[in-house]
Amino acid sequence: MQYLRLFFIGVLLYLAAVLPFILYRGGIFFYYGDYNVQQVPFYILAHRAVRSGNFFWNFHLDLGSSMGGSFAFYLWGSPFFWFSCLFPEKWIPYMMPFFMSLKYGTALCTSFAWLRTQTRTSRGALLGAFLYAFSGFQACNIVFQHFHEATAFFPLYLLALDHAHSAISHAGDKSAGKNPLSVKKGILGFVLMTSAMSVINYFFFFGQVLFLSVYYLIRYASNQKVRQTLKEILQLLLAGVLGLCLSAFFLVQVLDVISGNTRLDDFLLGYDMVAYSEPATPLAILKSFFMLPDLVGRGSLFTSEQIRNSSLSLFLPCFAVSGAIAYLRAHKKSWQRTLLLTCLVIAFVPILNAAFALFNSEYYARWFYMPILLLSLVTVRELEDADCGNLLFGARMVILADILFLLCAFLPTRPSEEAEGGISFLQIMEYPELFVTEAVVTAVMLPLLLVIVNGIEFTGKRPSSRERACCGLVTRTALALVILCCFLTQAGVLLNGNTIIAGSGGEKWRTQLLENRPEIPGYGNASFERIEADGTSTNYEMVWGYPTIHCFESTVSSGIFAFYQGIGPGRTVDSKLNFSHIGARAILSSHYYLENKLIRATKNYTKEGGLPGYQKVGESDGYNIYENRYFIPVGFTFDRFMTEDTYALLLDRDKTAADRTLVRDLILDDEAAAKYGSLFSGQDTDIDEECLSSDSYYSECRKRASTACTSFTTSKSGFTAEATLDRENLVFFSFPFEKGWSARVDGKKAEIVKADFGLMAVCVPEGTHTITFTYLPYGLHAGILVSLAALVILLAYFLLPSPLLFRSTVLR
């Protein structure tokens, strides 16, 4: 019952912070950035997929992608998402704040569970749990709601490691027996939490393993003999591997997506490994210790491109780092001190910080929630010890730092060369109005901090000596003030997030995305076709239910990355093409372009030159609709081909010619060219000047369309097409190449050929034939077998008497 009460307190506190903004928007939570164009569309698309039974492949996710691979980072492993599937799809956008509140309630419970093992009192653990669950990190990442699964369950993973250490270290004690149930439970808990955390979010799991490794070495290994430590590490590794094996059925679906993601190729190198490239970054890190956090993507003071999307915040409501400063002064030797200082060094050394993000060159502070839990602990420890002197010193340091940051906002700046006038003030900040909110909310907390560290009650009387001996400064007043500051932290960030968006933006988002669907004249006449909405309507197609070529999602199929990388534009977090890429649009079966006329009033389709071959065919839901008159249905053949190397040379010389060549030539690697080159009438090795003309391009589009499949249908397992060919040829399909695909022609197994760098083709004989593509995540069967084997081993260990697995005697 205690944890149930805590859970509902956390839920209600977050809902109290977000409710005014829901009411302001007319009953729905509208925020900014990725929340509007990723979190909500992703939930709706995934919810629809689950309800319709599409668990493996989704044709509405970019050019098509694996659900388990592409959404594993966002929601596929989230228990909160699967809970949302119990509700009707129409409810999902309105229930998003409720689902978020469940994560806050969970974080409050799990952090309390770990902190209770470290504090003297339950009240102290509760105060620390509020600091963690409602920290600045939590607030600034409301825009990234999939981060909160990791923060919600991390304290349990830390608790599981503590219990596993205790179990292993006492496994050989005679007083504990050879293999007591408590020892087994300790190991079992760590195995299960390792499995769960790897499924919940594999990206955060990597950072958690690193942090737990540092935590173990500092807290436990430093106090043990080397031989004992090595034995424990080996057993923990075995338990961890067993946990990963238990989740193999899930993780195998991620491997292909990870292996082809171009973002993994960007590593820190050279001086960037030891010093941040932008001088404002260390100052921004310092600011994150003391003040309400910046919005992700909208910095105020010390902002830069490097930290813009970093999720940078180490802020504890009310206390900031005053408790940590006090603890460092009071305790010269403790594992908490060593771990705090280690985290501080890691934060300011780029290569160490990057280790938590797979050494990516982009700056991320997305591991800061883990030291925040430690900051919460040491703050509570100081309060329980009633260390007024050191706490007051810490409070003064926080106040001094906040004053200095405020003064930095007034630093003089020299205007740009184009601007007139001399030195100006208050111009150093990119978003000064956001800094005002940060400063005001932080300033409101400072006197409350002084009230707590001075042990003042609301009545003006100090606690009794008995209460002070029991709880120190963790009084009811202190707890109430901390809860108030937790509310202010979330509300302050939410206020800033609502400040940067126009009032009409929420209404347009609600009307155009959720309540209506553009009716496209002629859509559905083709068996399969894609549309493309402009940049103001990112990912709207997911909600509307139209296949698209425009998608903002970081972890799509590796074939999509390879395709965009090969043809020129490249891809990082989204798939998008300039208006000049008409050839790429054609082979992707893009049929319609939608321009949001309600938003793009000045910078519109016509003024940007438009798309050659497109014409306006109607208006709907605030969109101008343009149809591609030279649309090529999916599944078609080519007469000519070009090798990847030749295309790369052409791309370097003339990007326009290279783009239009995509409609004339199928691009093959050397191996495929050698095997299937004889099927084509010719191979192009240089630019054909004719392909640069519009007439020639349109002619090639008509040729490709004339060879398109006569029928095409998608299913839960893939797609089926019928094609009539006048000769044996490769039939090209604009879906990403993945190892999980298998193809059959008239029921006979056929080889899938990688074409156009990352898409697919299959060899079909002359005549009319049925082509079937079936998708099953590569390695899924093997992953299931590994998971079942791990489950058997785990059950055997837990149920059978005296198993060998994990016994310390085995390692003697």
Task: Go through each PLM region and give its residues.
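Membrane-interface helix-loop-helix junctions at transmembrane boundaries of multi-pass membrane enzymes
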Residues: Q224-L234, G323-A347
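Membrane-interface micro-motifs in multi-pass membrane enzymes
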Residues: G69-Y74, P93-Y104, L131-L158, H165, ...
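Contiguous transmembrane helix-bundle modules in multi-pass membrane proteins
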Residues: F204, W335-L513, E766-R812
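Periplasmic/ER-lumenal interhelical loops and adjacent helix-loop junctions
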Residues: V37-A46, S65, A72, P79, ...
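Extracytoplasmic/lumenal acceptor-recognition loop(s) of multi-pass membrane glycoenzymes
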Residues: S70, T194, V482-K508, E519-S590, ...
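Active-site-proximal, structured, solvent-exposed surfaces of multi-pass membrane proteins
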Residues: A673-R812
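Membrane-embedded helix bundles of polyisoprenyl
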Residues: G10-Y14, M100, G105-T117, R123-I168, ...
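Active-site lumenal/periplasmic loops and adjacent helix-entry segments of GT-C-fold
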Residues: P20-Q118, R123-P155, G172, A196, ...
